[in-house]
Design a protein with these regions (language model features):
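Conserved catalytic-core segment of NTP-binding enzymes
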Residues: 1-94
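C-terminal accessory extensions appended to soluble enzyme cores
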Residues: 99-101, 105, 109-129
């Protein structure tokens, strides 16, 4: 199990090779936990003007500062998703094992609904192997 971040990916690769080489255990799929869902929005298109236009579409007023803040948040989220995808791809290239990607749960507490969401994603990932 790993996270789609540089250091955890490095550690997963090193650990996997050590386990296979020293212990002789054949490894199964790698679970990549905390993956942000992909967005249709590239980071470069997250602008204050786009936030203002989107707000007008749903008839909501946002100030210039709010539009700027929304654009910054959207750009950050898109950049984080791109980084995660790149790290998961790097993991796949360095460690030729199937991956089961679990979603990031956007909540402060894990309850029954979140456990079900993660379990469903895990089962779907297994079925896709």
């Amino acid at each position: 199990m790993t996270l789609p971040e540089e250091t955890p990916v490095n550690e997963a690769v090193d650990t996997a090779f050590a386990i296979e080489d020293k212990v002789g255990v054949r490894l199964g799929p790698v679970v990549v936990n905390g993956c942000y869902p992909e967005l249709a929005l590239p980071a470069a298109s997250a602008t204050a003007a786009a936030a203002q236009a989107d707000a007008q579409l749903i008839d909501v007023f946002v100030s210039d500062q709010e539009a700027s803040d929304l654009a910054a948040a959207a750009a950050f989220r898109a950049e984080r998703t791109e980084i995660q995808l790149a790290q998961a791809d790097r993991l796949a290239a360095a460690l030729p094992l199937p991956q089961i990607r679990l979603p990031f749960v956007f909540t402060s507490e894990i309850g029954p609904a979140e456990i079900e969401q993660l379990a469903d994603a895990f089962v779907d990932g297994l079925a896709a192997l």
